From Swiss-Prot:
The keyword ATP-binding does not apply. The chain crosses the membrane at residues 197-217, 225-245. This is Uncharacterized protein C962.01. SUPFAM superfamilies: C2 domain (Calcium/lipid-binding domain, CaLB) (SSF49562). Residues 266-471 form the SMP-LTD domain. Residues 1-76, 103-130, 899-932, 1280-1303 are annotated as: Disordered.
Length: 1429
């Protein structure tokens, strides 16, 4: 009995800690529980179950506890999650399986087979413990309410037969199919005859013919039956031997072919993946089947005819065998960030070839049973349709589009390389004894295959592909969202002339543009010409890259238009290339009937992106985009007119009075219309939609209309709107907006017309920023400026610092509709998206009103910038929690407009609305009077007299020497480009990109054009060329211009562009001047009377430190107090005012740290530009002088970007396919440390220092001085924290020496720089001042008595009085002699009986006066106030 029990136990799920087995109760042996199955969780160790005596089946111990049996008239289904069995009614398909169930434990007994009967009425309830299983919702409860009751979902619900039966059945099937698979012995004929059968076709034919003739002769001659029997036996033996030979020959040929070298070496198997997929499938197939069945039921319910009341699945399972990846082939890379692979897949639930023994025991075939209920009234009938033995196989091509942003795969495109093979056993009438498979009908299989091919051909059959945007899916964007917009500009067409001389006329023509039968626009009609010129731009919304753009040429000479010819544009090629400009041929009946010249540009949809931390990055705001509309339910239409069930209504949707979609359905009140469409909108602030309802019987007049302005519709998103005719009748309208960055030819001019001024932001510092990094490090903050969800400017980041100091100047263009701008602190991430640390809003209108008080001359003579510092509170975007403070000062200047032919009414309207939004637009006289002092129109010659202004460059096209490069445009020493074009796919790309840059000094400004390899991280420069901005403005102002960029091979790359210059009346802050940056040529000559470092002598060498970082190191002169070096180096100086150049003389020691012999600071401001200065630099030691020659050469040296991603990708989008509108120039747009290059904190692993690639010089050392972007520590000067010094700005008028005209000489500019710095800051006095230090109020202190101890550099300690927490207030002055930059140690202690306990300690070191909060431990902090004496 024990052995029998062990054989009967077969786990359903193998390789798991708990499996399910089915065994008959022991009471069934005695006839008390016949037919009942007892289901219990058991262990995978079969031996422990096998040794259990039969008498303990009803009462198990330990963890093996069985549930008491229940009475059932049908089949029990065991729930593997809850551990319970539920009764299931018997169906015709399940009754047969019940009759074949053998009780486990006595499977060999014939008596037990008779126990499967209906004698289970009086079943005793055996004693035993109930199974305690985790609770979970049953699968049936998740089915839709309209589904068929007790529907069978998933393979686990199907599996209810005995394991032994299933195993024996498939073993018999395999043995029957493989009866001769290993046969090697000779046949009977081969044993007793020398004749060998080779399996040729004529041998089989001869055997059949001989058997037929001999049988006929035997019957004709009336022989006995045994003669006929002998003939049949002999023929069978011979034929069997022949078939064995056939199989043997086939195997030999297969082995012969397999022995050959396989040509498909690129294909790989995916056994490991199939193993994982099988395990995943076994666990999740029920949920997958439930989800699929539910969605399919809901989909087909919308299309059911009226006589079909319900269609639901009674059984749905895809089988227990998972789909398989048979093999995979990955293509060699042909495009950047694209992976292409071919996959052979199959779904064969009824195939056991590759199923292991454990999976075979619980194998369930696919089974889908759809029950359709039809009829009328009480006469309802059910019609079951059963689909089983589903088989699907095919070849799939998958194209992965990779991305550097999360989820790192942008798009996944799928395409069938050939029509997939589909077969299934479909029975319209599911009767067990009637095999009514529709595939038995001749030709039906081929018909289904052909129809499937026709269906897939236009959707996913190669080269058509089904595209899925994974990043959009992660961001919650619904599938089916438009891919983008195609701007199609049709220039002209050509038609073949009529050969018939009797027709003496010229035709009238027009062209239509359609996709999938929907017309998007048409050109004007051009009459009496064979070569019509249209110059018309049509915008087409692209919903799928598989739908070609159809251009149709019509002849409008007759009463109705006649089709002349058609041509097609592939949107997928356009999507990949970005631009197509060509001449296509019109064809009619495969005959060339004309041509069309066009330019097509693809503008992708701007979709939100989801980051790895779960936050969502919204796309930039744009007035151009795609409006997606879905018309929902219409309610109470009977309030408007009399309608019956036979009435048919037509719903028409208009966008800006143009019909875009319509739908006609039968009238049913409160029924969804389900009319979905989209349309391209040029300006969402001025557009509107209209819905009209027509009765089909009287379509001339609408019975109901409703109009909704687009801003209101987009603001609501989904709302109910009332019809105009009767407010009781309503319609539900759902809409969402997809912005698209469409760049038109007039976009640059439109941008200039809307540009009213510039905001100067001096981002000084931030305090108490939140830490979003791990506890072992701190955030890497930077600040960025956001206008309308677009990042238009940013600073460099400060590594590992929660109190960063930037002192950077950013220039932000202000448009007519700009009300506020956001200043946001971000944490820089080397990989992934940066994280927000908090943001603050700045009201632009306040500064515009301040600028209105000054006329043009006053604006031009006033230094651009203020001394007012605003400490803005940073808050989180979610929850509005405080995240720290950021200190900035702001100023605004208007722009002056050039006097052009359309100079304009719109410009003055935009300026008026920007300068005073409360003034009515119709009051033009008042508007002009108020704004004439701010913004006026000047001539081109007058514009060139202004040294500062905005330069807008429009890149039109290029002639390149190579493909795969992009164009980047820089201004002056900008770290980041203000224009970045898409990667050129051809040698003649048409980019249509533009960007705007702030030019501070037109006389000295330079514009650099750079061709790179297009990499976002560390792009490789192919070639570059710099031109004077003044020459560029003079030559290209308002007209096309070509810039030549020499290549590495000597050939020229031509870039065609135009430029617009808008002056800004201002006096430039001298710190931002060209004269303040450049290259320092340092000639180290000799030293005299150096101090003695070792015994009687020294081994001196000299190190130059720029902002604390080594910029030059001389050689070591051994044992000499008067060394001679004669070494030279060039050092890049980005800011003479803030950069600190220190000379340090060391004594070299072997194996030890060098000793300092003396130091001295070199005053960079005292150097005259381009003048050699011979200096004897005295060391701070008792003796020692260093003789050196210094020459400062002003110039622009581009800084190296600290971020590894091109900053233009985050800027305001203004060009197609990634070309961004940015604010460039020195100090503009991004990361340009104009006023604080040297004060951005210590350089960590993320920082990029140096600009060695952009510096040239002579001598042994060409040193990069851009290490001013470096740690300052003790070199932080008062300029960084003192607004009046760091910004060097005042509201008073600058002196005449500071007002530098365009043609100023460098020497006089240097004098102006020095003079202004001395006047505005008083630098000598600043260093001599002393300050008072106060201890203010504590915060988040413990509830104890606390005192503060302050220790200075001399280790002198000062204690405050004791105060009670948690918010003690001291307000005590600390009698310490302290200067800016000195360190103070602040510690908090509590007193107790045993002494003092230190709560925490912090180092206080600041370079400015004001109130600061010092964190001394955990969240505890104390205010430290610094005042000047």
């Amino acid at each position: 009995m024990e052995g029998e029990n062990s054989k009967s136990v077969h786990p359903i799920l193998s390789h798991s800690t708990s499996v399910v087995s089915e065994r008959a109760s022991s009471s069934g042996v005695n006839g008390t529980n016949g037919g009942m199955k007892q289901v219990s969780p058991v262990s995978t160790a079969r031996t422990s179950i096998a040794r259990r005596p039969p008498s303990t089946v009803g009462s198990q111990t330990g963890s093996l506890v069985n549930a008491p049996p229940k009475r059932s008239s049908g089949i029990e289904r065991f729930d593997h999650v809850t551990g319970t069995a539920e009764n299931r009614p018997q169906t015709p398909s399940t009754k047969a399986s019940v009759a074949n169930v053998k009780p486990a434990g006595a499977a060999e007994s014939a008596q037990n087979a008779n126990l499967i009967s209906s004698k289970s009425e009086n079943v005793p309830e055996p004693a035993g413990e109930k199974v305690s299983m985790p609770e979970k919702q049953d699968l049936q409860s998740a089915l839709p309410s309209d589904a068929v009751s007790n529907a069978v979902i998933g393979w686990k619900s199907i599996y209810h037969a005995s394991d032994v039966d299933v195993h024996d059945h498939f073993a018999n099937v395999l043995s029957a199919l493989q009866w001769d698979s290993h046969r090697v012995e000779p046949s009977i004929l081969e044993t007793y005859s020398s004749y060998k059968l080779t399996g040729q076709w004529w041998q089989s034919t001869s055997i059949l013919l001989a058997v037929s003739i001999l049988s006929w002769i035997a019957s004709k001659l009336w022989f006995r039956f045994f003669i006929l029997f002998f003939i049949i036996i002999t023929g069978t033996i011979v034929y069997g031997s022949c078939m064995i030979s056939v199989r043997r020959n086939i195997r030999e040929e297969v082995v012969q072919e397999l022995s050959k070298k396989n040509g498909d070496v690129d294909y790989e198997t995916m056994s490991w993946f199939n193993t994982l997929l099988q395990r995943f499938w076994m666990l999740n197939e029920p949920e997958i089947s439930k989800s699929v069945s539910t969605s399919v039921e809901q989909s087909i319910a919308e299309y059911l005819p009226s006589f079909i009341k319900e269609a639901a699945f009674s059984t749905f399972t895809l089988g227990s065998k998972a789909p398989r990846i048979d093999r995979v082939r990955t293509h060699p890379p042909v495009e950047r960030d694209v992976v292409l692979m071919d996959v052979d897949f199959s779904l064969t639930p009824n195939d056991n070839y590759d199923v292991n023994d454990s999976s075979l025991k619980c194998r369930v075939n696919s089974l889908i049973s759809l029950v359709i209920k039809f009829g009328f009234g009480k006469y309802m009938f059910s019609f079951p349709i059963t689909i089983k033995d589903l088989r699907l196989s095919g070849k799939l091509r998958i194209r992965w589009g990779l991305s550097s942003d999360y989820p790192f795969i942008q798009t996944a495109s799928f395409s069938f390389l050939e029509t997939p093979i589909v077969y299934a056993n479909i029975r319209p009438i599911d009767i067990p004894f009637l095999d009514a498979d529709i595939f038995y009908i001749p030709g039906i299989g081929q018909f289904v295959s052909e129809q499937l091919g026709l269906l897939l051909n236009s959707m996913v059959l190669w080269p058509n592909m089904f595209d899925y945007d994974l990043s959009a899916m992660m961001a919650g964007i619904a599938s089916g969202t438009a891919v983008g917009v195609v701007g199609l500009k049709i220039y002209s067409a050509r038609r073949g002339e009529v050969s018939d001389s009797s027709i003496d006329r010229k035709p009238s023509s027009f062209i239509t543009v359609t996709t999938s039968g929907r017309e998007h626009g048409r050109t004007p009609i051009r009459s009496n010409t064979f070569s019509p010129t249209f110059d018309t731009t049509i915008y087409v919304v692209i919903n799928s890259l598989n739908d070609p753009l159809k251009l149709s040429l019509y002849d409008n000479s007759g009463k109705s238009p006649i089709l002349v010819g058609t041509t097609y544009i592939d949107p997928r090629s356009l999507y990949e290339r970005g631009f197509i400009g060509d001449i296509y041929q019109f064809l009619y009946n495969a005959v060339n009937v004309g041509s069309v010249a066009f330019d097509a540009t693809f503008f992708p949809s701007l979709l939100p992106k989801k980051t790895m931390d779960g936050s969502k990055i919204e796309p930039p705001e744009s007035s151009k985009g795609i409006l997606n509309v879905n018309l929902g339910c219409v309610n109470n239409l009977t309030e408007l007119t009399e309608l019956t069930k036979k009435s048919s209504l037509k719903y028409v949707l208009y966008v800006d009075s143009k019909e875009v979609a319509s739908k006609t359905i039968k009238f049913v009140d409160r029924t969804p219309i389900s009319l979905q469409t989209n349309a391209y909108i040029e300006n969402n602030k001025k557009s509107s939609i209209k819905v009209a309802v027509f009765d089909v019987k009287s379509p001339e007049k609408a019975i109901a209309t409703v109009s909704v302005p687009l801003p209101e519709l987009l603001h609501e998103g989904y709302d109910t709107f009332h019809f105009v005719e009767n407010p009781k009748a309503t319609i539900d309208i759902e809409s969402f907006w997809t912005p698209v960055d469409v760049v038109e030819e007039k976009s640059a001019k439109t941008y200039i017309d809307n540009l009213v001024g510039v905001m100067r932001l001096s981002v000084i510092k931030a305090n108490d920023l939140v830490n979003v990094e791990l506890p072992t490090r701190k955030s890497d903050p930077y600040a960025r400026v956001i206008v309308g969800n677009s990042v238009v400017a940013r600073t460099v980041y400060t590594p590992n610092n929660l109190n960063p100091i930037w002192n950077e100047i950013l220039y932000v263009p202000i448009m007519a509709d700009t009300k506020t701008i956001d200043l946001e602190a971000m944490d820089y991430e080397e990989s992934g998206n940066d994280r927000s640390l908090g943001y603050a809003s700045i009201n632009v209108q306040k500064y515009i009103r301040n600028a209105k008080r000054l006329d043009r001359s006053a604006l031009a003579s006033t230094v651009f910038g203020t001394s007012e510092v605003n400490a803005l509170t940073l808050t989180s975007r979610k929850g509005q929690s405080v995240r720290g403070t950021i200190s900035v000062n702001c100023d605004y200047r208007p722009c002056l407009r050039l006097n052009t032919d359309n100079s304009s009414k719109q410009s003055s309207e935009n300026v008026q609305s920007a300068t005073d939004p409360t003034t009515p637009a119709k009051d033009n006289s008042t508007s002009n009077a108020e704004t004439s002092s701010i913004t006026s129109v000047i001539s081109v010659n007058e514009a060139l007299q202004y040294p500062s202004g905005f330069a807008l460059i429009s890149i039109v096209s290029a002639d390149l020497q190579d493909v795969g490069v992009d164009l980047r445009v820089f201004t002056d020493n900008a770290a980041f480009p203000f224009i970045t074009t898409p990667i050129a796919k051809t040698k003649t790309p048409r980019w249509s990109s533009f960007g705007i840059s702030m030019v501070r000094e037109l006389q000295f400004s330079e514009t650099t054009f750079q061709l790179t390899d297009g990499a976002k991280k560390d792009p490789k420069v192919v070639c570059e060329h710099s031109v004077k901005t003044l020459d560029l403005v003079s030559e290209a102002l308002g007209r096309p211009y070509s810039v030549e960029i020499p290549g590495s091979n000597g050939q020229l790359n031509h870039v065609r562009l135009s430029i617009t210059y808008m002056p800004v009346p201002m006096t430039l802050n001298p710190m931002e001047s060209y004269i303040n940056s450049g290259s320092l040529h340092f000639m180290l000559q000799d030293g005299q009377n150096l101090p003695i470092g070792d015994i009687r002598s020294s081994d001196p060498f000299v190190v130059l430190k720029l902002n604390g970082e080594s910029a030059f190191k001389s050689k070591v002169i051994k044992k000499n107090l008067n060394p001679v070096w004669n070494e030279e180096a060039d050092i890049v100086v980005q800011n003479r005012v803030l950069d600190v150049l220190e000379l340090v003389c060391y004594d070299w020691d072997m194996g030890e740290k060098p000793d300092v012999l003396g130091t001295s600071n070199i005053d960079l401001l005292s150097l005259e530009p381009n003048v050699e200065s011979q200096q004897s630099i005295k060391l701070d030691s008792k003796t020692g002088t260093i003789n050196a020659s210094l020459r400062f050469v002003p110039g622009w040296h581009r800084r190296k970007a600290v971020l590894d991603v091109t900053l233009a990708d985050n800027f305001l989008h203004a060009a197609n396919k990634g070309a961004k509108l940015v604010v460039g120039g020195v100090g503009a747009a991004g990361g340009l440390a104009l006023a604080g290059v040297t004060t951005i904190g210590s350089v960590g692993s993320k920082a990029v220092t140096g600009v060695a690639d952009g510096v040239t010089g002579t001598g042994k050392h060409i040193i990069s001085g851009a290490k001013g972007i470096s740690k300052m520590g003790m070199f932080r000067r008062s300029l960084e924290k003192n607004p009046s010094r760091s910004d060097l700005t005042t509201t008073q008028e600058a002196s005449s020496s500071a007002s530098v005209p365009p043609a100023i000489a460098p020497e006089s500019a240097n004098a102006a720089l020095t003079s202004t710095i001395d006047k505005t800051t008083g630098a000598p006095e600043l260093a001599q001042k002393k300050y008072k230090v106060y201890v203010g109020q504590g915060k988040n202190m413990p509830h104890k008595t606390i005192k503060i101890i302050v220790t200075d550099n001399q280790d002198h300690s000062f204690k405050t009085k004791s105060r009670k927490g948690p918010s003690p207030s001291w307000n005590e002055e600390i009698p310490v002699k302290w200067s800016l930059g000195d360190e103070l140690r602040i510690s908090a202690v509590t007193s107790n009986l045993l002494g003092h306990t230190k709560l925490g300690e912090a180092v206080f070191q600041e370079d400015a006066i004001g109130t600061f909060r010092v964190v001394i431990g955990g969240s505890s902090s104390v205010e430290i106030k610094v005042e000047a004496e």
